[in-house]
Design a protein with these regions (language model features):
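Secretory targeting and sorting signals
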Residues: 1-34
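Low-complexity, acidic Ser/Thr/Pro-rich repeat tracts that form intrinsically disordered stalk/linker regions
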Residues: 31-43
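Surface cap/lid and interfacial helix-loop subdomains adjacent to catalytic sites
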Residues: 36, 47, 56-95, 110-121, ...
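Short coil/turn segments at beta-strand junctions that form active-site/ligand-binding loops
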Residues: 41-42, 127-130
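Short beta-strand element of the alpha/beta-hydrolase
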Residues: 43-50
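Second-shell loop/turn segments in exported
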Residues: 53-60, 100-107
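Phosphate/oxyanion-binding active-site loops and adjacent basic polyanion-contact surfaces
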Residues: 104-115, 139
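Gly/Ala-rich beta-loop-alpha elbow adjacent to hydrolase catalytic centers
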Residues: 133-148
Length: 300
């Protein structure tokens, strides 16, 4: 776990350092055209924690959890050039872990709404602030969705406000996706930043997992539009959250079933009823093709 955190921390800094350097040297028009408003910073890191790391009434402090462990090096590097905030939401996977009992799919929707609200509020208050978006696990799925909306021009802020996006263990990762979709092995700087710092970042050498995210296939569809090259989608090989076998639709069926259910260990009867309800709709969503492909012949 320690080595993984070190790699992710290094990767996260790689995504954000071009914006930090631009802010510090006052060469990025989008960042440095005017002094930041009171209480603002040239760069705002907005993080969405993973399952079990936050709750409906959780803290907005981004110093703990996986994201906290990788944001701290950036804060140490950049000092007053950055601020950060966590987006709390019901992250208990239907009650399976701490964080709430809202079914996973509903909590993802809640997280998306709260992330959009946070970005809108900060952008309205801080005219000259750039953003780095970061998400871990379930939080990465939330950030992935909003990043795609921003890149396609339908998000809460414009794409030129986003310095970088870091997705860690993303359940919405496309199968075989490179670490930096649209860019390859290193991120790209903002087109008008005037910074060449990104050219000094060594290529990211970790192997590219050939699987994809375990989340609903609809969530992995689409691209990042204008944010292509500024998104880092980091996945450790073998991590089922982001490297599930791409040729096994049944994996998505099981995830879809769990994602619609309340999984309260103290209420097995209620859990069973919730799973039964989800199973009814999941059977329709899955379709007979899944049964034909994955539950037939010698596979039983």
């Amino acid at each position: 776990m320690t080595s993984l955190r070190v790699r992710l921390s290094t990767a996260f800094v790689a995504v954000t350092v071009p914006a930090v350097v631009a802010a510090g040297t006052l060469v990025a028009p989008g960042i440095a055209s005017a002094a930041p408003s009171a209480g603002c910073a040239p760069l705002y890191v907005v993080g969405v924690p993973g399952t079990g790391e936050t709750s409906d009434t959780g803290s907005t402090d981004l110093s703990s959890g996986m994201l906290g462990s990788i944001v701290r090096p950036l804060a140490s590097l950049a000092g007053s050039l950055t601020k950060d905030v966590a987006v709390p939401y019901d992250a208990g996977f239907g009650g399976a872990v701490k964080g709430g009992d809202m079914p996973y799919a509903q909590s993802v929707t809640q997280g998306e709404t709260r992330l959009k609200t946070a970005l809108t509020q900060i952008a309205n208050r801080c005219d000259n602030t750039q953003f780095t978006l970061a998400g871990y696990s379930q939080g990465a799925q939330i950030v992935d969705k909003i990043a795609k909306q921003i890149g396609q021009g339908s998000g809460p802020i414009s794409a030129d406000k986003v310095a970088g996006v870091a997705l860690l263990g993303n359940p919405a990762r496309q199968a075989g996706s490179p670490t930096f979709p649209g860019s390859g092995t290193r991120p790209e700087a903002l087109a008008d930043s005037g910074s060449s710092a990104v050219n000094n970042i060594p290529p990211y050498q970790a192997p590219t997992p050939q699987g994809g995210g375990i989340g609903p296939t609809a969530d992995s569809a689409g691209d990042y539009g204008q944010l292509e090259g500024r998104v880092g989608d980091f996945c450790a090989p073998g991590d089922l959250a982001c490297d599930a076998p791409s040729n096994s639709p049944i994996v998505h069926v099981v995830t879809n079933l769990a994602g619609q259910s309340k999984l309260d260990q103290q209420d097995p009867v209620g859990t069973l009823a919730s799973v039964a309800t989800a199973l009814g709709s999941t059977a329709i969503k899955a379709g007979v093709d899944v049964v034909n492909q994955d539950v037939s012949g010698d596979t039983l």
